[in-house]
From Swiss-Prot:
<feature type="transmembrane region" description="Helical">
    <location>
        <begin position="7"/>
        <end position="24"/>
    </location>
</feature>
<dbReference type="InterPro" id="IPR028055">
    <property type="entry name" value="YidC/Oxa/ALB_C"/>
</dbReference>
<keyword id="KW-1133">Transmembrane helix</keyword>
<dbReference type="GO" id="GO:0032977">
    <property type="term" value="F:membrane insertase activity"/>
</dbReference>
<comment type="function">
    <text>Required for the insertion and/or proper folding and/or complex formation of integral membrane proteins into the membrane. Involved in integration of membrane proteins that insert both dependently and independently of the Sec translocase complex, as well as at least some lipoproteins. Aids folding of multispanning membrane proteins.</text>
</comment>
<dbReference type="GO" id="GO:0015031">
    <property type="term" value="P:protein transport"/>
</dbReference>
<dbReference type="GO" id="GO:0051205">
    <property type="term" value="P:protein insertion into membrane"/>
</dbReference>
<dbReference type="Pfam" id="PF14849">
    <property type="entry name" value="YidC_periplas"/>
</dbReference>
<keyword id="KW-0653">Protein transport</keyword>
<keyword id="KW-0143">Chaperone</keyword>
<dbReference type="InterPro" id="IPR001708">
    <property type="entry name" value="YidC/ALB3/OXA1/COX18"/>
</dbReference>
<dbReference type="InterPro" id="IPR019998">
    <property type="entry name" value="Membr_insert_YidC"/>
</dbReference>
<comment type="subunit">
    <text>Interacts with the Sec translocase complex via SecD. Specifically interacts with transmembrane segments of nascent integral membrane proteins during membrane integration.</text>
</comment>
<feature type="transmembrane region" description="Helical">
    <location>
        <begin position="436"/>
        <end position="456"/>
    </location>
</feature>
<keyword id="KW-0997">Cell inner membrane</keyword>
<keyword id="KW-0812">Transmembrane</keyword>
<keyword id="KW-1003">Cell membrane</keyword>
Amino acid sequence: MDIKRTVLWVIFFMSAVMLYDNWQRDHGRPSMFFPSATQTAPAAASGASGTGATTTAGEAPAAAAAGAAPATTAPAAQAQLVKFSTDVYDGEIDTRGGTLAKLTLKKQGDGKQPDLYITLFDHTAGHTYLARTGLLGGDFPNHNDVYTQLNPGATSLTGDQNTLKLSFESPVKGGVKVVKTYTFTRGSYVIGVDTKIDNVGTAPVTPTVYMELVRDNTAVETPMFSHTFLGPAVYTDAKHFQKINFSDLDKNKADYVNSADNGWVAMVQHYFASAWIPQQGVKRDIYAEKIDPSLYRVGVKQPVAAIAPGQSADVQARLFAGPEEERMLEGIAPGLELVKDYGWVTIIAKPLFWLLEKIHGVVGNWGWAIVLLTILIKAVFFPLSAASYKSMARMKEITPRMQALRERFKSDPQKMNAALMELYKTEKVNPFGGCLPVVIQIPVFISLYWVLLASVEMRGAPWILWIHDLSQRDPFFILPVLMAVSMYVQTSLNPTPPDPVQAKMMKFMPIAFSVMFFFFPAGLVLYYVVNNVLSIAQQYYITRKLGGVKKKPA
């Protein structure tokens, strides 16, 4: 009857294990519990990131042929990479298809570490991630055709410019010529993409514009236990945010809205995302599919009204490629902030992040914001914690009497249980009275876990002294050691289980958890350390001042 703390530790441990196993399966890695098909190793792309590189996507499967964006064919003409630079991007546009083939996000470090650049789009021998467009509905220009840069000149955003425009013209195919224009704006992670379709033939044409993101299933390199969802996502007013697992695309079992006149499609990874955002109110079809052993795409197909000879049509869209900063995403498109995925705890996690952000706005340091948020949460839950610790204090007081009863009736379990129940009744103690207050707090605990895990704001954010990046593990393992010590102290304050096996398990738990926490992001471990220290202080105070009672003889 005295195993409630053991039960809670087991629940906590199993929750952590299941979270990790869920991450394993989300990223195409073998589950620890459920068998899965072996993932195919990423196929090497044939392009390189130098001049003349092309966007090779492999042959599309037969199922994707009808009405789908074309697969990449063998190059018929030499393509080039046009480099560009803005205050937030360094990138390359491949003239084959006018494809956005490389995009590096620039973020300045704090001077104590390298600048926090990350390459989002890329096309190398080991990794493919592209944003491309083209036309369907006839032998029209698509991403396999070599475009020509119009008005070659400055490709960098200078100090007195707010926008940078780069235009590319396709060859004439099927009586159609396409001019694709990228517009980069200072300080913005939203790229304007304008597709101008000129009918230079002698008959009307009715093309369809496709806009897609192509990516392999290679996991992003981040610290252990720091991964979230990786894969395509679709947002519509009808179904809101729908994640699509690569494994579902492998089996052709993906479930998502395939037609809408609103929303967006995206590729999501830890901390960063890209999304095609067509104009609202314009009908489009949505598709997501596997096009190579390790290559996938998600996109939209938007029909264009008939274009008479000598006339033209414009299709405008926006391409987001940047960090998953919640407030910024909310201002770009409805629902785009959902790419920062908190899973089933979103309803609790979003208010927690809002509060964390407000505290950061005051103190200006994410580490101290975590500390203050933890203190605030502990204050809110103090009545529940007090009830739990009072119950544990009472149990600790009567533990000697319980042990005496167990020893006296060890040969008669029924009499022993009856005597224990009578003792609980006499002393007005509920052996599980400390469990419910703790269980109620578990959703908040898990929600804050995901807040700290999913927030790109932690990336490169320093705290004090040796902690220069709250999204990375503690380089000297000081916080995990403090975590282990605090867990040991907290365990020692609890009633000692009468069962020797349970007692050993309680002593082993801090060691087991500390090993796991050695690989957690420093911001997450900081929360646990502060939470444990506050819990120890609360428990000590309540045990000594509020929950203390005089021992009675057995």
